[in-house]
Swiss-Prot record:
One of its GO terms (molecular function) is mRNA binding. Required for specific RNA editing events in chloroplasts and stabilizes specific chloroplast mRNAs. This is RNA-binding protein CP31B, chloroplastic. The gene is CP31B. One of its GO terms (biological process) is mRNA processing. Its main location: plastid. It comes from the Eukaryota. It is found in: Plastid, Chloroplast. Residues 113-191, 207-285 form the RRM domain. Keywords: Chloroplast, mRNA processing, Plastid, Repeat, Ribonucleoprotein, RNA-binding, Transit peptide. Signal peptide: none annotated. Disruption phenotype: No visible phenotype under normal growth conditions, but mutant plants exhibit multiple specific editing defects in chloroplast transcripts. ADP-ribosylated by the Pseudomonas syringae type III effector HopU1. ADP-ribosylation reduces the ability of the protein to bind RNA. It holds the Pfam family RRM_1.
């Protein structure tokens, strides 16, 4: 008499371990089948199962590679193992292709497409900056610079567009663009590993103006625009803290002649700027020790 016995038929179920991103298999439940003998038949191929692994990552900064797992749990145990080692002609693939260290794989955007973005509101982070510049094209890299000690934005950052044309469009669109009451300064970033040579500043003390009690969000560009209404501004600079990059609340403006200095002082000394009465007077030349 034919007896019914439990013949464990192993179905391979693809599973992933999120902590190590590995694939492994476990047996399925027992299937009832007929057999003449009272023994358990385990049918497992001794041939290795090839799992093709590949990972796809996009050239992004400050993000980890995206790992996409594709698994299939159809009746693999009922299908024959293929000649290539796959089960029933079905393979489990995890696509993994990293960019090599020398940049081969995904082309780097041109350096000319990297932009400096200054006078950022302090609550704008890298994601918000990227979303803003996407109006001009594809943003490859977006980075707001933070103070390492306070973890606060230093009020500037960098955006790399996909092409030089998109970078030029972004400069045209966003330079002097107002965000949360602040006008952005957008221009080409200096090439990697180099800095533009600064011309030595020659000040005539008679034409140099001290500006005090400035609002904290006033930068050099805004200071220049304020004084340009009263003459030709040769140079304008808000003094910043070396450690934090924040304004120290005062700066200096150099006009082109003495008459413009007098006009600017008369017009702006004591004027209200964002609720603060600014102090404007002739800068005193420091005695060098």
């Amino acid at each position: 008499m034919t007896s019914s016995v439990l013949t464990p038929s192993l179905k391979l179920l693809a599973m992933t371990n999120s902590s190590s991103s590995t694939l492994f298999c476990i047996p399925s439940i027992f299937n009832i089948s007929s057999s003449e003998s009272h023994r358990f038949n385990f049918s497992l191929s001794s041939r290795p199962v090839n799992l093709t692994l590949s990972l796809k990552s996009k050239t992004l900064r400050n993000s980890s590679p995206v790992v996409t797992f594709v698994s299939q749990t159809s009746n693999w145990a009922e299908e024959e193992e293929g000649e290539d080692g796959s089960i029933g002609g079905t393979s489990v693939t995890v696509d993994e292709s990293f960019e090599s260290e020398d940049g081969v794989g995904f082309p780097e955007p041109p350096e000319e497409a990297k932009l400096f973005v200054g006078n950022l509101p302090y609550d704008v982070d890298s994601q918000a900056l990227a979303m803003l510049f996407e109006q001009a094209g594809t943003v490859e890299i977006s980075e707001v610079i933070y103070n390492r000690d306070t973890d606060q934005s230093r009020g500037f950052g960098f955006v790399t567009m996909s092409t030089v044309e998109e970078a030029e469009k972004a400069v045209e669109k966003f330079n002097s663009f107002e965000v949360n009451g602040r006008r952005l300064t957008v221009n080409r970033a200096a090439p990697r590993g180099s800095r533009p040579e600064r011309q030595p500043r020659v000040y005539d003390a008679a034409f140099r103006i001290y500006v005090g009690n400035l609002p904290w969000d006033v930068d050099s560009g805004r200071l220049e625009r304020l004084f340009s209404e009263h003459g030709k501004v040769v140079d304008a600079r808000v003094v910043s803290d070396r450690e934090t990059g924040r304004s120290r609340g005062f700066g200096f403006v150099q006009m082109s002649n003495e008459n413009e200095v007098n006009v600017a002082i008369a017009a702006l000394d004591g004027q209200n700027l964002e609720g603060r009465a600014i102090k404007v007077n002739v800068a005193e030349e420091r005695t060098r020790r």
